[in-house]
UniProtKB/Swiss-Prot annotation:
UniProt site positions, description: Required for activity: 363
Catalytic activity, EC: 7.1.2.2
Record carries keyword Nuclease: no
Top class in the EC scheme: translocase
Protein residues bound to ATP: 170-177
Protein function: Produces ATP from ADP in the presence of a proton gradient across the membrane. The alpha chain is a regulatory subunit.
Gene for this chain: atpA
SUPFAM superfamilies referenced in this protein's UniProt entry, alphabetically: C-terminal domain of alpha and beta subunits of F1 ATP synthase (SSF47917), N-terminal domain of alpha and beta subunits of F1 ATP synthase (SSF50615), P-loop containing nucleoside triphosphate hydrolases (SSF52540)
Assembly notes: F-type ATPases have 2 components, CF(1) - the catalytic core - and CF(0) - the membrane proton channel. CF(1) has five subunits: alpha(3), beta(3), gamma(1), delta(1), epsilon(1). CF(0) has four main subunits: a, b, b' and c.
CDD domains in the cross-refs: ATP-synt_F1_alpha_C (cd18113), ATP-synt_F1_alpha_N (cd18116), F1-ATPase_alpha_CD (cd01132)
Chief location category: plastid
Protein name: ATP synthase subunit alpha, chloroplastic
GO molecular function: ADP binding; ATP binding; proton-transporting ATP synthase activity, rotational mechanism
């Protein structure tokens, strides 16, 4: 018969008591009262934070936006088709954040930083909050380095600096996205990381942009964040903040970044949809009262870091679509007042064959020549004034029957200057090539040519200089100044090429 020993039993009980780990889990839960149109009303969740992520029973994630006395309004990050009335919801205790790493370069992701290009998962050890505060005044320094777009009209007259926010605005189909993609293509070899955020665009348009970037080898330094027109409003609202978070990650690692938002007016529409469904009071054009803050907190994150923070930069290029040229609508005026200047694209110029269709008269950069190299300042200083005078004269000349010789010469010069600003899509020019082009036009070397010959001559001149006078490019890139020596080389090349060109044309 087995004898029961009391000390053995007490030892076992003691051992079990020592091993017992008392864990108390406190969950903040609630119940779904109502769900539909991407919005859920939750009863409970008493201690939820504004902007906190909540998880539904079937796995959908939402963001608590409306904290009311008797319920919580949650926007869903998904279709929410499986959520049922009466099902439970728990607060996660986390604010929306995404993983960040170098591995995102060359990838196409959605607003939750999940890859959508079918090339597998992205490994990341760090994460950042989607909504993070913009750098303060002490953390910034004034913009002083240029961000070359490769477009003569912009780099010479509406220069963009690293850390600036420049709005690209115009009607639909005026080449706004083309300006942005050319800017990305021109950053090749410039050590600038680009982020392109497509908000509410057609999937085919986004695919076209990605294909262009891949063909030109620009995806190596680019991240594409895409939420197409069929995405839930919540994800379209979040996409720009996801892009900004990725750009910020590189900025704080002392790198230069450029971010394109295409376009914030679609984000505002998604936010309006969410706000109206949450029963927030509508304001002008039915947008909620805080739609200005929606864009200001996004665009204020673009900055040029101080030397203490490593002088990284984040340049923002928001693209806003206008309706039949109405720049005074609500969203365009909001974004104009937040940014440091705007590039206005005109449908009339576009249809007249002037592409990029930049209306130089009403476009402006509030950073100005601080964002240009000295050589560009020296050469392009009087270009904007000459074009403005030409536009005025051209309007006047329509009504005048006989014009004096000086006016005719000025009109002829203006037409040739306008011609040299034309560029093909996806063909950005290096700053040295732009200097060659502008100098040739402003100093009257094109006056003897027919308007139809101008572009052909300039292409051949740039090629001739590259092959026969490589010292010119070396002087500009090393000194950043248009020296006497560089000018002499350029004059010599123009004369030599002009003789060759005129002989060719006669044959």
């Amino acid at each position: 018969m087995v004898t029961i020993r009391a000390d053995e039993i007490s030892d076992i009980i003691r051992e079990r008591i020592e091993q017992y780990n008392r864990e108390v889990k406190i969950l903040n839960t609630g119940t779904v009262l109502q769900v539909g149109d991407g919005i859920a009303r939750i009863y409970g969740l008493d201690e939820v934070m504004a902007g906190e992520l909540v998880e539904f029973e079937e796995g959908t994630i939402g963001i608590a936006l409306n904290l009311e006395s008797n319920n919580v309004g949650v926007v869903l990050m998904g279709d929410g088709l499986m959520i049922q009335e009466g099902s439970s919801v728990k607060a996660t205790g986390r604010i929306a954040q995404i993983p960040v790493s170098e591995a995102f370069l060359g990838r196409v992701i959605n607003a939750l930083a999940k890859p959508i290009d079918g090339r597998g998962e992205i490994s990341a050890s760090e994460s950042r909050l989607i909504e993070s505060p913009a750098p303060g005044i002490i953390s910034r320094r004034s913009v002083y380095e240029p961000l070359q777009t490769g477009l003569i009209a912009i780099d010479s007259m509406i220069p963009i600096g690293r850390g600036q926010r420049e709005l690209i605005i115009g009607d639909r189909q005026t080449g706004k996205t083309a300006v942005a993609t050319d800017t990305i293509l021109n950053q090749q070899g410039q050590n600038v990381i680009c982020v392109y955020v497509a908000i509410g665009q057609k999937a085919s348009s986004v695919a076209q942009v990605v294909t262009t970037l891949q063909e030109r080898g620009a995806m190596e330094y680019t991240i594409v964040v895409a939420e197409t027109a069929d995405s839930p409003a919540t994800l379209q609202y979040l996409a720009p903040y996801t892009g900004a978070t990725l750009a910020e990650y590189f900025m704080y690692r002392e790198q230069h970044t450029s971010i394109i938002y295409d376009d914030p007016s679609k984000q505002a529409q998604a936010y309006r949809q969410m706000s109206l469904l949450l029963r927030r009071p509508p304001g002008r054009e039915a947008y909620p009262g805080d739609v200005f803050y929606l864009h200001s907190r996004l665009l204020e994150r673009a900055a040029k870091s101080s030397s203490r923070l490593g002088e990284g930069s984040m340049t923002a290029l928001p693209i806003v679509e206008t309706q039949s040229g109405d720049v005074s609508a609500y969203i365009p005026t909001n974004v104009i007042s937040i940014t440091d200047g705007q590039i206005f694209l005109s449908a009339d110029l576009f249809n007249a064959g002037i592409r990029p269709a930049i209306n130089v008269g009403i476009s402006v950069s509030r950073v100005g020549s601080a964002a240009q190299i000295k050589a560009m300042k020296q050469v392009a200083g009087k270009l904007k004034l000459e074009l403005a005078q030409f536009a005025e004269l051209e309007a006047f000349a329509q009504f005048a029957s006989d014009l004096d010789k000086a006016t005719q010469n000025q009109l002829a010069r203006g037409q040739r200057l306008r011609e040299l600003l034309k560029q093909s899509q996806s063909a950005p020019l290096a700053v040295e090539e732009q200097i060659i082009t502008i100098y040739t036009g402003t100093n009257g070397y094109l006056d003897s040519l027919e308007i139809g010959q101008v572009r052909k001559f300039l292409v051949e001149l740039r090629t001739y200089l590259k092959t026969n006078k490589p010292q010119f490019q070396e002087i500009i890139s090393s000194t950043k100044t248009f020296t006497k020596e560089a000018e002499a080389l350029l004059k010599e090349a123009i004369q030599e090429q002009m003789e060759r060109f005129l002989l060719q044309e006669q044959v």
